[in-house]
Amino acid sequence: MSQEFDYIIVGAGSAGNTLATRLTEDAGVTVLLLEAGGPDYRFDFRTQMPAALAFPLQGRRYNWAYETDPEPYMDGRRMECGRGKGLGGSSLINGMCYIRGNAMDFDGWAELPGLEDWTYLDCLPYFRKAETRDIGPNDYHGGEGPVSVTTPKAGNNPLFHAMVEAGVQAGYPRTEDLNGYQQEGFGPMDRTVTKNGRRSSTARGYLDQAKKRPNLTIVTHALTDRVLFDGKRAIGVTYLVGDSEERVEARARKEVIVSSGAIASPQLLQRSGVGPRALLESLDIPVVHDLPGVGENLQDHLELYLQYACTQPVSLYPSLLWWNQPAIGAEWMFNGTGIGASNQFEAGGFIRTRPEFKWPNIQYHFLPVAINYNGSNGVKEHGFQAHMGSMRSPARGRIQVKSKDPRQHPSILFNYMSTEQDWQEFRDGIRLTREIMAQPALDPYRGREISPGADVQTDEQLDKFIREHAETAFHPSCSCKMGTDDMAVVDGEGRVHGMKGLRVVDASIMPLIITGNLNATTIMIAEKISDKIRGRKPLPRSTAKYYVAGDAPVKGKPMREVKQG
């Protein structure tokens, strides 16, 4: 059985749903959207309630639950690499932080040959196009887009305000909008949540407006086996439905677009015969095109938590107790309000640790409870924590297919903490975080340091803590990078080098990881490239002003000095 469409999109995630929605705005264009996971069940609180964000990571229904190979610089730990499975992709299970990256990230991309139209001012109109911000549009934010963005409001947890004030007291800037004129500094953090308190995944935002169109066909539980080629032209795909071993074939008249994410996109290309020749030949995969960069240049954000006891009963600790959860769930279900309606990452910041960094190299997420991101190891008392992570590690990893079997996970290695810069940034980051947490704004709340613990002071002690406790921020990217050099996989429009009718459009095509969470930027990339595919003129460049640190000092004098080992 074979079906024919103009475009086949592999992966209904942040990029794939955006592309499917935009391409089918043209009524004469037919699109097949394939998703290996299931629907985004709207009555499943695990994916729809913002405060329940840890639940999908604990199971396999919505999570691919990849693991890395033993990471050599992390005591050989096999580390989590959760990715979303189901309509919405990772936007169905992420932390819902709406952060776009720093303007300098995109200006840096645009300095690379062939990527001249990826400057921040070229990208900003597409960020705005995708967004509806609840407090209204301005030069930086949209008011008519599919992605619902909610801003923190007065009356939220007092710890958010105290942690931002502590950052300012430590000598860093205050910013009212981490996606506006100035990212650098501390301030409120927007979230992809609807006005009714539901997760704003791309399934809800984009597919809800597109799924009834007669020119869009969506198939869930459809695991793409490989891309089919006629010479160097992509002509279709084969896929498996559910547990069946029968391969279904679909043909593409125009293009196959791979939007499977930074892990699965290179895996699919390699399995289809597009990738490093030696790897493919070692697995008896017929080589369609020797493209050495497929699966290389893999990047991520690593982070750790600094946890503190809270001396006042204002943290979210009571919400972790089962007997309080029915009332929280009921308020969220019927009113769309309360603790359940927030991801609880309502404040954060970006700082530079040293003058050689021209824009922030450390990100903070503040959380008014002490618990692991995946919901494990909750501290059994009132507490709060700062998630601290480096933004642009020089470490580079890789994805390698292990077999022709589409159900076998690939070999994943990030090489976390493999450079001296990594260690310097994390040591600096821990010490600067302690200085922030010691400021007067937190005096009414701060108890003992739970983790790492006040006795962890020397470089050696900090390094041991980092090796044992640092975790992924779940931001894999850059494994099919845009560019023109020998290791580039696609051009500035996502077209695979040396091939015809084949694109990759998702976080894997970022040439360098951005300063912040990836979801908003992945959607922007898909919005921008969809105009290219449709032959539309790009949106006019923005004229908005944006902050460049230049010679500005990294920080001012802290209100309270802290002596550390």
UniProtKB/Swiss-Prot annotation:
Enzyme class, spelled out: oxidoreductase
Recorded family membership: Belongs to the GMC oxidoreductase family.
Binding positions for FAD per the UniProt entry: 6-35
Annotated catalytic residues: H475
Keywords: FAD, Flavoprotein, NAD, Oxidoreductase
Disordered: region residues: 182-201
Record lineage: Bacteria, Pseudomonadati, Pseudomonadota, Gammaproteobacteria, Pseudomonadales
Pathway: Amine and polyamine biosynthesis; betaine biosynthesis via choline pathway; betaine aldehyde from choline (cytochrome c reductase route): step 1/1
Annotated function: Involved in the biosynthesis of the osmoprotectant glycine betaine. Catalyzes the oxidation of choline to betaine aldehyde and betaine aldehyde to glycine betaine at the same rate.
InterPro entries according to UniProt: BetA, FAD/NAD-bd_sf, GMC_OxRdtase, GMC_OxRdtase_N, GMC_OxRtase_C
Biological process, per Gene Ontology: glycine betaine biosynthetic process from choline
GO molecular function: betaine-aldehyde dehydrogenase (NAD+) activity; choline dehydrogenase activity; flavin adenine dinucleotide binding
Catalytic activities: choline + A = betaine aldehyde + AH2; betaine aldehyde + NAD(+) + H2O = glycine betaine + NADH + 2 H(+)
Name of the protein: Oxygen-dependent choline dehydrogenase
Superkingdom to which the source organism belongs: Bacteria
The protein's required cofactors: FAD
Gene: betA
EC number from the UniProt entry: 1.1.99.1, 1.2.1.8
GO cellular component terms given for this protein: membrane
